[in-house]
Amino acid sequence: MPAEKSIYDPNPAISQNAYISSFEEYQKFYQESLDNPAEFWSRVAKQFHWETPADQDKFLKYNFNISKGPISIKWMEGASTNLCYNLLDRNVRNGLGDQIAYYWEGNHPDDYSRGLTYRKLLEEVCRFANVLKDHGIRKGDRVSIYMPMILELPIAMLACARIGAVHSIVFAGFSPDSLAERMFDCKAKLLITADGAWRGEKPLYLKALCDTALEKVEEMGHSVEKCIVVSHLKRVTPCQPDHVEEEIPWTDDRDYWWHEEMEDKEPACYPEWMDAEDPLFMLYTSGSTGKPKGVLHTTAGYLLYAATTFKIVFDYKPGDIYWCTADVGWITGHTYVVYGPLANGATSVIFEGTPFFPGNDRYWSVIDKYKVTQFYTAPTAIRALMKFGEGPVLKHNLSGLKVLGSVGEPINPEAWLWYYKYIGKEQCSIVDTFWQTETGGHVITPLPGATPMKPGSASFPFFGVKPTLLDECGIEIKGEGEGYLVFSQPWPGMMRTLYNNHERFEDTYFSKFPGYYCTGDGARRDADGYLWITGRVDDMLNVSGHLMSTAEVESVLTEHPRVAESAVVSRPHPVKGECLYCFITPNENEVFDQKLISDLKKMVRERIGPFAMPDVIQNAPGLPKTRSGKIMRRVLRKIAVNDRNVGDTSTLADEQIVEQLFANRPVEAK
């Protein structure tokens, strides 16, 4: 493989027509965005509808320094608008009513839609907004959504935005416990789900999971009043021979069918004009303490940032067909399946299936079928598909592709080069995007026509984003070096707070280095100024792009009656990027056996979700702890990869435990 110094210039055909067509042009706009952010973003704002315009003197106000008062970020204070109006009504009025907003591709290739136009999408959103109003949902109410990747999902989100309700989407791979915890935290008034869905050859009965979650949330002391259910299973192809549908559990006066509720509703609904800083949505992300954090995004700034990053990073032009494979249950789906594309009048594919069903060429067949021009997926998927070689790719015509995106975790150079060579045929730009639930949109990314690409590097900051590298003492690292990745000024799309917990927001992101937003990630800057994300610097795990905390997994493991203590670390995985390696100390007189391992894997799967299931569970008679009782995780990470260079262990209470843990490494870890 080429050394990291290898640079791949953008295809001149892409640069020629790109919004940002050279690195010099990028640098010019970037400097403007830092020197005068209010002027830069007010130009962007002119393309959108504002019921009340912004006061230029109040365009940006912020405090990042906790020692100077509460952390506060405000963009366009005093302005009012409605996000749904800007995404749908504005585009219809601008002549895009008959343009396709979404093609839907189901789990089975026989299930697909011929396309939902902007006009039809607006009508459906208004109908469902009227359904929500009839069920008592008003501005500021929280609505939880737990759905598969079907067209009703963006319709539900936009209906919430239209009436000023705050949506809280929970990825439909999360367990009922996780759903209940999130509904309880946000005090949801209503839940929207589907009876079920197919994932590959496996049926998922979502309504049954929701019923379990609704019972749990009731036990916690909160009642979710209504549940609206999409009848999805009957309209799609079963993916198992002789499949018999399970009965859908139902509670009268609480549960309502979506199609029945929509029947008599008006296809018009006046939008609720929202203040610029009114909440738009909240999305839970894992916290290092184990309790999920309700990241809150607001109206105006998020609109500006989602729209601009989508347009510039994917270089989207009228007539292009864009496909992001992310589930809308994650921030990538919010910003780059729904809000960003629709703000630009784009045509997108929404995909319900998996990369491997019915064959391992499914992604390439979808790209061919819809003539996709921009494709955005995760390194995990790319690495999994690399295993099948070039054969499945060659069966399909991918010649329409112009931009290939990567998201969720750093992409290793081998996967980058395979993506570039076999999917992009060395003609496409690869945008390796770094960002977080908290940032709202891309913060470090190449631009397709402007940035010479280095395999594995996220490259340079987006407009308005000012990254800094700090050492452990908070001293800035200039030039080449590696440290904590922080940002010193706000961009419009960044989170404003954690729902109902501003103190935790300040403590998590602003207390370690006063004056800076701390990402929790490390980064390295090379001699050319390129940034390379080195991974989490806190106790977080990134498995197949799913961020979770060690505390979250450990708390499940230690609930088992035979377990005294547990510690979880990540270790590299060729497909998932990272996998979970768990150390388990059984209770006194308990045996560590295969049944315990199976039980623990099952518990994690059920309590958190299938993506969190540990790859390795090791017997640990004791854990490497300092004399103050703190687990030395860096030692456990070394044991997980069988690296005996563990460094200084003199502060350990019992140094002999390290050798014992090396000796105990299970066969599957070797």
UniProtKB/Swiss-Prot annotation:
Its EC number is 6.2.1.1. One of its GO terms (biological process) is acetyl-CoA biosynthetic process from acetate. It catalyses: acetate + ATP + CoA = acetyl-CoA + AMP + diphosphate. The keyword ATP-binding applies. Signal peptide: none annotated. Transmembrane segments: none annotated. One of its GO terms (cellular component) is cytoplasm. It is an enzyme of class 6 (ligase). Its main location: cytoplasm. Pfam families: ACAS_N, AMP-binding, AMP-binding_C. Keywords: ATP-binding, Cytoplasm, Ligase, Nucleotide-binding. GO terms for molecular function: acetate-CoA ligase activity; AMP binding; ATP binding. Gene3D superfamilies: 3.30.300.30, N-terminal domain of ligase-like (3.40.50.12780). PROSITE patterns: AMP_BINDING. It is found in: Cytoplasm. Belongs to the ATP-dependent AMP-binding enzyme family. Activates acetate so that it can be used for lipid synthesis or for energy generation. This is Acetyl-coenzyme A synthetase. It comes from Drosophila melanogaster. The lineage of its organism: Eukaryota, Metazoa, Ecdysozoa, Arthropoda, Hexapoda. The gene is AcCoAS.
